[in-house]
């Protein structure tokens, strides 16, 4: 990797990815919804005000990068939300909102920056194991599961279409990570830190090849079923 765009870098996993890549000498562009002041203070290039639910916003990001002559060697799309719901009390506005962020977010963002991808570039889209059809043994979490299952399809489609340009795409499950996103997650779980998840996801993208493109991988390195 050399020039890396990290989307959703305000906090959590993407924040840690940005810092770890910067610390090892990569040229990191951190796309943040807010100002990303602490990342900027650390010497990381910050693109503030990037809203993945807005076509205008992500196209403006791509235009700014293009005007600066930026070419991307890797993209980590991490921005996402998780609101829990159950059958009998489904909020369809909430479902639409999660799809807007978790599914259409990576679709519109990667489509916008696609012309900036170098041949041989790598794209990592953070989804979730709960979006796996084969792994769903408990039900519930309707809107989150739906949005992440669809995000997996977004990534698989990008694999097929971008491979023609020499770009590899990986779907990423970070594991059970202790962030604001998971604080209300049901059940007892053994959590890892955002720093641990980031290190695993970076390693996955480092090791990504055209032969492993289009797969779904845990931050611990294991490949997951769809």
Curated annotation (Swiss-Prot):
GO MF annotations in UniProt: oxidoreductase activity, acting on the CH-OH group of donors, NAD or NADP as acceptor
Gene3D superfamilies: NAD(P)-binding Rossmann-like Domain
Protein EC: 1.1.1.398
Domain of life, per lineage: Bacteria
Alphabetical list of InterPro entries matching this protein: NAD(P)-bd_dom_sf (IPR036291), SDR_enzymes (IPR052184), SDR_fam (IPR002347)
EC class: oxidoreductase
Keywords: NAD, Oxidoreductase, Plasmid
pH dependence of activity: Optimum pH is 9.0-10.
Catalytic activity: 2-glutathionyl-2-methylbut-3-en-1-ol + 2 NAD(+) + H2O = 2-glutathionyl-2-methylbut-3-enoate + 2 NADH + 3 H(+); 2-glutathionyl-2-methylbut-3-en-1-ol + NAD(+) = 2-glutathionyl-2-methylbut-3-enal + NADH + H(+); 2-glutathionyl-2-methylbut-3-enal + NAD(+) + H2O = 2-glutathionyl-2-methylbut-3-enoate + NADH + 2 H(+)
UniProt similarity note: Belongs to the short-chain dehydrogenases/reductases (SDR) family.
Role played: Involved in isoprene degradation. Catalyzes the two-step NAD(+)-dependent oxidation of 2-glutathionyl-2-methylbut-3-en-1-ol (HGMB) to 2-glutathionyl-2-methylbut-3-enoate (GMBA).
The protein's name in its UniProt record: 1-hydroxy-2-glutathionyl-2-methyl-3-butene dehydrogenase
Organism: Rhodococcus sp. (strain AD45)
């Amino acid at each position: 990797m050399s020039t890396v765009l990290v989307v959703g870098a305000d906090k959590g996993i993407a924040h840690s990815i940005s810092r770890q890549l910067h610390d090892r000498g990569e040229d990191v562009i951190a796309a943040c919804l807010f100002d990303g002041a602490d990342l900027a203070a650390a010497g990381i290039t910050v693109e503030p005000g990037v809203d993945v639910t807005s076509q205008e916003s992500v196209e403006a990001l791509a235009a700014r990068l293009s005007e600066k002559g930026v070419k991307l060697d890797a993209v980590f799309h991490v921005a996402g939300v998780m609101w829990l719901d159950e059958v009998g009390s489904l909020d369809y506005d909430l479902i639409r909102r999660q799809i807007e962020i978790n599914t259409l977010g990576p679709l519109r963002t990667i489509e916008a920056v696609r012309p900036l991808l170098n041949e041989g570039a790598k794209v990592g889209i953070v989804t979730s194991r709960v979006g796996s059809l084969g792994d769903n043994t408990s039900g519930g979490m309707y809107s989150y599961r739906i949005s992440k299952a669809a995000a997996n399809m977004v990534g698989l489609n990008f694999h097929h279409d971008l491979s023609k340009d020499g770009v590899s795409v990986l779907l990423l499950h970070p594991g059970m990570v202790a962030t604001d996103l998971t604080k209300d997650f049901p059940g007892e779980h053994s959590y890892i830190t955002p720093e641990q998840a980031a290190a695993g996801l970076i390693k996955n993208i480092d090791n990504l090849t055209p032969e492993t493109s289009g797969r779904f991988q845990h931050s611990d390195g294991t490949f997951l079923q769809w």
